[in-house]
Amino acid sequence: MNREKTIYGEYFHYPAATDWEKISARPHLDTQQLAEVVKDVLADIKANGDEAVRKYESKFDHVELDCLKVMADEINEAEGLIDDELKNALLTAYHNIYTFHESQRFQSHHVETCPGVDCWQKSMPIEKVGLYIPGGTAPLFSTVLMLATPAKIAGCKDIVICTPPNKEGKVNPAILMAAKIAGVTQIFKIGGVQAIGAMAYGTETVPKVYKIFGPGNQYVMAAKQHVSLTDVAIDMPAGPSEVCVIADDTSNPIFVAADLLSQAEHGVDSQVLLITTSEMMLDEIIAEIKSQLEVLPRKQIAVKALENSKFVLVHDTAEAIAINNAYAPEHLIIATADYKELSEKVVNAGSVFLGQYACESAGDYASGTNHTLPTHGYAKAYNGVNLDSYCRKITFQYLSRQGVDSIGHAVVTMAENEQLEAHANAMRVRLTNL
C-alpha cells in the first residue's frame, strides 16, 4: 500500500485490511481536559442560576443581558426580517420533516405470551426537552426544525431552546422563525456550556428539562456528557461532523467534490473520507476540489478540514463498503452504479444518501430525514434522532388466575434458585389462592 500525506489529507492506495484502523481513526479529543474546563462552569450555574449564566454570557458571548428569555415581540419582529424565499424554504423543509417523522409513530398491540398473561407497551412523550442550537460562524436554524418538529409530534409539553445571542443581545431571526414554525414553547439567549447547565439544572428563568438534544463545539459536547452522568439524559455522544463518499468510474467528479467540500466547510475539525475504485476518478475529484475551493467563502475552514481527510483507492465497491462499515460515518454517500446493491450491505452509518443526485445537503435541510446524527464512530451503536428519541416505552402486564397458573411455578422456582425468597413468596401466595 502507498500512503502519502498532502495538503488535502492522506492518500491510501489499495490498503490492506490491517490499514483500515488507520483509515478509520479520527482526530484525538482530550476529553479529560475538556471535562475539567466545563465542570467548574456547570457547578457555578447549578449553585448560582441566572447570575452565573449572565456572567458567562458576558465572558464567552461578549454580551450583557438584562433578560435571558426571548419575548413574543422579538419573535414577531424576526418574522419581518425574513425574506419570502427563506420563509418558503423553511416551510418546505418543515413539511417534509414533519411528514417523515409522523410516519414513525409507534403502534402498540397486546401480546398473550401464554394463557392468561397479557403484555403490551405504551409510548409516552418526554414531558420537558431542551434543544441546543449553535450560533457562532453559521447559525443552524435548520437544526431547530430537525429537533423541535419531532418533539412536537411526540407530544412533548415543554420544548425549550437555548441559542447564543449576538453582541447586541439578539437571536438570529431565522432561528426564531424556525422555532415559531415548529412550535417551540420557550427560547433563551444562552450559548455554550452555560446553556447546557441552565437546561440540565434549571435556573430562576430557565426550566429544568429531562433530556437535552443538539450539536455544538467540543465544550458543549463535554458539558452534555458531564450532565448526563447524573442529572439529565442526552441525545447521543458526538464529535466533529464527517462524511464518507463511495465513488466509481461512473460518478460525477463535480458532484463528489461539492459533497466533500460541503462537509469540510462545517468546521476545521470536520473530516471527509473518499473511497473510490477508479484512480482516474480520484484525480478528477482532487482537481475539482482545488477548483471549487477557490470560490468558497469559507475556504480557509475547508482547507483546514481537508488536512484531517483521507482519500482511498480500492479494488472494488465491496471493499469500499467494508471500509465504510469499519469507519461508521455520520453521513454516507454512495454515488456508484451499484448503489442499490451496496445499500443492502451498509451496517454502520448515521444517514445514507443513494445515487448521483442525493447530496448530503438534501438531508441536512429538506428531504425529511433528521440531520442530528452520531459521529466519531458512534454510528456503530447509536442511531440518529428520530421520533422515538422523544418518547419512552412503558411496559404493562396483566395476569389472570389462569396466568398465575401458567407461569407461577416457573417464577417460584427461578426466585428460589436466585435465593430471593420474598420474590418467590409473592407468587407462591397467589398460587395457593387459585
Residue ranges and their predicted role:
Residues 3-15, 186-191, 311-316:
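Short acidic-hydrophobic, aromatic-tinged amphipathic segments that line or gate anion-handling sites
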Residues 183-271:
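Conserved NAD(P)+-binding/catalytic subdomain of aldehyde/semialdehyde dehydrogenases
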Residues 266, 274-349:
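A glycine- and small/hydrophobic-rich beta-loop-beta segment
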Residues 106-111, 233, 270-275, 295-305, ...:
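Flexible, glycine/charged-enriched surface loops at secondary-structure junctions
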Residues 326-434:
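C-terminal core of ALDH-fold dehydrogenases
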Residues 1-127:
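N-terminal Rossmann-like NAD(P)+-binding subdomain of aldehyde/semialdehyde dehydrogenases
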